[in-house]
């Protein structure tokens, strides 16, 4: 089967924009029609460049870029993407190197995994990290207790210094390791830059419009394009649905992705405080036991706190041999959002001057802020029993203690788009020949692969059309065959539809 003569890509996010970029760089598509559709106007009048949607998921100020995964294929992809983040994609401070402190709770990292321990997720990631890191295990620093973690951060032990320390490797404790091969990216700036690159290459027609429905052939066996809400019809040989949280709705497959929101909070630092943390080579903090992470200081001198997505929590608990059911308020509940024009575009949440959520009828927000506060106090808070009796051994770090108790200055919602298998869906829809391709289900981590996900998607588009000549460069892992299986379309969902 020949390569498509025309494309419609629905969605100018991670999957869609990166695919448009890959097509623009490939001479085989120099004379092909490529249309990129998004309901957000990235190039409004009088703008000097592209402007990202400030409430979209990809508007994040500091998205974690890590290669530390407990799953080999994603670890390999992240390692490949990291090279690009440290090159062209990360120029002009779009990417910032920051080491990662990756932790969980349970027995020592030097012992085998045990059931019901979240540190299993860390142990698996640690083993892969040792394989990928030059120098192996000797080059990866292990922090095998909460006290070691706090000491690494420059804080005092979590217990009064005159009490004995439990060194039992089987005891439950916070344990982790430090990876130097990580950082964060200004996601909004990255999307704006990539959009400008696509426009500069001049091969893609960008259309502002919201897709109302797919357009089918008379016999319903092929997709001919899309119809916009204003009635305009766009046609192409291949339609690619990469619409993020709206993909399930456009495709009419509610259970393809679970769409929901979580809360992100920020603490403002002074310039002096932020500079001091940078001087200390402050790490990204990830505690998979609490399901909480902290990134920064960012370019605005803020620390950002977020929750793992539900899929991320499920992934951690699976490694602990704990089975978790589908979210009880999952797929069906999302339907009420489809008519809301703000759907999947996040949104600000009002907070008081003291950092409390103004909407006191929002228990989810209150729980999120409580989780972040506990996370902070555990790592950065003052030593227990300080102020009672520390036998004159008080060595508390006022900077860290102050941050641990500081009000949150900003809270926002961000949307997640999880697949049941917790893997992306990058494959042809099986019901329409080779006329409808799906690229969605970012599961809270697709942005890490922004520099390479487009070329992988294009390779799968061509390979699955029967082009046996399509391959990745020698030595690149995972192979196209592995990706094709990992990101296959879940045909079983069509039986329930």
Swiss-Prot record:
For this UniProt record, the keywords arranged alphabetically read as follows: FAD, Flavoprotein, Oxidoreductase
Q: Which residues carry this modification: S-8alpha-FAD cysteine?
A: 414
Entry keyword Membrane: no
Quote the PANTHER family the UniProt record gives.
PEROXISOMAL SARCOSINE OXIDASE (PTHR10961:SF46)
Q: How does it assemble?
A: Dimer.
Question: What does this protein do, in the record's words?
Answer: Amino acid oxidase; part of the gene cluster that mediates the biosynthesis of the isoquinoline alkaloids fumisoquin A, fumisoquin B and fumisoquin C; as well as small amounts of fumipyrrole as a shunt metabolite. The products of the cluster lead to a brown coloration and are important for growth and conidiation. The nonribosomal peptide synthetase-like protein fsqF, which lacks a canonical condensation domain, is required for addition of a serine-derived dehydroalanine moiety to activated tyrosine but is not essential for the subsequent steps leading to isoquinoline formation. Is able to convert N-methyl-3,4-dihydroxy-DL-phenylalanine (N-methyl-DOPA) directly into cyclic isoquinoline, in vitro. The absence of the meta-hydroxyl group, as in L-N-methyl-tyrosine, leads to a 25-fold lower rate of reduction and the formation of the demethylated product L-tyrosine, instead of a cyclic product. Does not accept the D-stereoisomer of N-methyltyrosine, in contrast to N-methyl-DOPA, for which both stereoisomers are oxidized with similar rates.
**Protein name per UniProt:** Amino acid oxidase fsqB
Origin species:
Aspergillus fumigatus (strain ATCC MYA-4609 / CBS 101355 / FGSC A1100 / Af293)
**Gene of this entry:** fsqB
């Amino acid at each position: 089967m020949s390569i498509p003569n025309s494309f419609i890509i629905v969605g100018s996010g991670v999957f869609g924009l990166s695919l448009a970029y890959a097509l623009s760089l490939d001479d085989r598509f120099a004379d092909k029609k490529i249309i990129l559709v998004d309901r957000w106007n990235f190039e409004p009048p009088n703008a000097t460049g592209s402007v990202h949607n400030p409430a979209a998921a990809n508007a994040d100020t500091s998205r974690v870029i890590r290669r530390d995964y407990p799953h080999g294929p994603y670890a390999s992809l992240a390692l490949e993407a990291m090279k690009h983040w440290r090159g062209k994609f990360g120029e002009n401070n779009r990417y910032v190197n920051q080491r990662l402190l990756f932790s969980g709770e349970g027995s020592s990292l030097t012992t085998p995994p045990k059931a019901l321990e979240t540190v299993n997720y860390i142990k698996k990631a640690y083993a892969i990290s040792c394989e990928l890191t030059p120098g192996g295990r000797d080059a990866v620093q292990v922090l095998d207790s909460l006290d070691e973690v706090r000491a690494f951060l420059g804080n005092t032990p979590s217990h009064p210094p005159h009490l004995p320390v439990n060194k039992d490797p089987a005891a439950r404790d916070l344990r982790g390791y430090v990876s130097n091969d990580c950082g964060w990216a200004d996601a909004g700036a990255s999307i704006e830059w990539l959009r400008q690159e696509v426009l500069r290459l001049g091969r893609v027609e960008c259309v502002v419009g919201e897709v109302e429905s797919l357009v089918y052939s008379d016999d319903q066996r092929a997709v001919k394009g899309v119809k916009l809400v204003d009635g305009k019809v766009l046609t192409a040989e291949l339609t690619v649905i990469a619409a993020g949280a709206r993909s399930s709705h456009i495709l009419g497959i509610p259970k393809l992705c679970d769409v929901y929101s979580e809360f992100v909070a920020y603490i403002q630092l002074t310039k002096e405080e932020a500079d001091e943390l940078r001087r200390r080579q402050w790490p990204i903090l990830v505690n998979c036991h609490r399901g909480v992470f902290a990134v920064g200081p960012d370019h605005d001198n803020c620390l950002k706190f977020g929750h793992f997505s539900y899929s991320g929590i499920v992934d951690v608990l699976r490694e602990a041999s704990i089975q978790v059911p589908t979210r009880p308020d999952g797929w069906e509940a999302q339907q009420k959002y489809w008519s809301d024009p703000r759907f999947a575009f996040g949104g600000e949440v009002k907070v008081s001057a003291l950092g409390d959520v103004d909407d006191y009828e929002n228990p989810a927000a209150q729980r999120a802020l409580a989780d972040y506060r506990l996370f902070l106090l555990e790592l950065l808070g003052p030593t227990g029993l300080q102020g009672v009796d520390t036998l004159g051994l008080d060595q508390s770090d006022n900077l860290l203690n102050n941050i641990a108790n500081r009000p949150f200055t900003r809270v926002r919602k961000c949307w997640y788009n999880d697949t049941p298998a917790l893997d992306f869906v990058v494959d042809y829809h099986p019901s329409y020949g080779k006329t409808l391709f799906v690229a969605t289900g970012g599961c809270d981590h697709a942005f890490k692969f922004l520099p390479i996900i487009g070329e992988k998607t294009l390779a799968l588009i061509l390979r699955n059309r029967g082009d046996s000549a399509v391959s990745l460069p020698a030595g690149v892992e995972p192979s196209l065959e592995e990706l094709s299986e990992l990101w296959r379309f879940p045909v079983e969902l069509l039986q329930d539809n």
